[in-house]
Amino acid sequence: MSHFSTIKTQLKEAEPLIMALNNLGYNINQEEKFVKGYRGKFTAVDISMNLAGDTKVGFKWNNNSNAYELVTDLDLWKFELPVERFISKVTQMYAYQTIISKTQEDGYQIVEQKNKNDGSIELVLTKWDN
């Protein structure tokens, strides 16, 4: 029997989460604020998206943990990445977006960016004082 699973994350802000999802090539579904599951059941989410293989995924705010949780029906997960790897990629891009936004606010510029073989991203930043 299929049911919805919620997976805790450390993602605390909507804007960098949406930017991360978009940068990874995932389209946010602006009209739907729910995730469909087995036998047409659905659950409400704050951010909804469709992955390949008709996999439905959403992120829902959890007031207790002050973070978003991933919501999906794991029995219907047909995406090419395992759910753990998907969360890892989203978390990495979320951190990247957060760092870029904060450093630009503080007057830093990216001098160099390297995507390493191990999947990490190396940034070199500079700030010019007047």
Predicted regions and their residues:
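Interaction-mediating elements
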Residues: 1-130
